[in-house]
Structures are given as structure tokens and as C-alpha cells.
Amino acid sequence: MSQGMLTILSAENHNHASSMLANTLIDLISQNNGETTIGLAGGSTPSLAYSILGQETDLLANVIFWLTDERWVHHDDDLSNSKMIKSSFDKNDISLLYPDFSGDNATLDAEKYTERVLSSFTEFTCAVLGVGEDGHTASLFPGSNALDEKGVKFVSTNVEAHPRIRLTATFELLAQIKNVYLLVTGNNKKDIVEEIVKGETNLPVNHLINIRTETHLLTDQL
């Protein structure tokens, strides 16, 4: 498979990378005529960028946020990405689409979330993604059943992390997003950043880069 274009934005440290990402999103929203849709990753890495972005209250009025992946828990659970994201935006009343938690059928919950997202908008402006030390992005982990899913936008998957059951966007969905930003910071991510830049291994993050025309990497490890 041919390698997609990787645009690297080097930062001095995590705070600098977070500020760069937030300002990039602010510029994108400002330049976008009409509604903007932004996919958000969970975890602690992007929380500062979200907090900076959350200060732009008026600008966010025309933004619909959605989740690139979610732990299969209630959206108010302390483990949920939804709760972390809302907290990061410092009580700014953002429009965030999150999946319902049935508690008994993750596959059906993923299907319903697909319907919720696609009925709300049809154009995916951009998304923020993290990358794990094992090369996973969203909840597309190495060896996961979700890696080979075709014809669907979100699926449920079992992963080697807690909680095990996740809902995740598929490669098919992530490939059609106009702008994808990988935020990868910290000394523990140095090795995986090198793997991303080399592009020689078929880790989930490298596969994503290869199926896209262009992907942006913001990191303090280069």
C-alpha cells in the first residue's frame, strides 16, 4: 500500500503541542462557513487542548462534536470519554453527540450511534486522535476485530485494556474525515512516534495514515 502524506508539526513540549492543536482548530472553525463537525478522542493527552478551545464560547456555537471512540459505560461514568471531554471544556455547553449505553448489547449501541451521527450531519470536518504506545488509535488496537470491519462507521470491540468493551470509529469512517490531527506527546511516546514517521510497520496508526491522503502529526518528540 502506498504511504499517505504525513505533515509533522513539531512542538517544544506537551503544552505547546496542545496550544498548537487548539489554535489550529480555532482557525479551522473560523474559516469554515457554516457548521463544523469535530471528532474528539478521549484520554488525558488532549484535555488541555480541549480546555483552550473551550474558551471560544461564541465560536463553538456552530460546532457539533462527536466521539472517535468511547468506553462501553454510561456517558456520566467516571471512565467515559464523554465525561472527560465535558469536564475539559470547563462546563461550556458544547453540542456533543455521545452513544447511549444499553448495558446489554454493545453491537446494537454502535449501530445506534452510527445512526445518531449520520442523521446529525454528513460532512466530517476534522478529528483529533491519540496514539497508544502499541500503535492503536481511537479503539483500533493491534489484532482487534475492528481493524477489518467494512461497510460500517462504528463498531463494538474487545480490547486489552480496561474497560475491555469499546465503541470505535472504523478505518472506513476515519478515512473520509477532511482533516485528522494526531496528538502524540510525552517521552513514553518517543518510540511510537519514530515508528509513525518511518511508516514501515502496519500498526493501526500507520494503516490509517496510508489510507488517507494527508494526516497531521503534532508531537514534542521530534
Sequence positions of predicted segments:
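N-terminal glycine-/serine-/threonine-rich phosphate-binding loop
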Residues: 1-38
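Glycine-rich N-terminal segment of FAD-binding domains in flavoprotein oxidoreductases
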Residues: 27, 34-54
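ATP/nucleoside-binding phosphotransfer catalytic cores, i.e., glycine-rich phosphate-binding loops
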Residues: 178-222
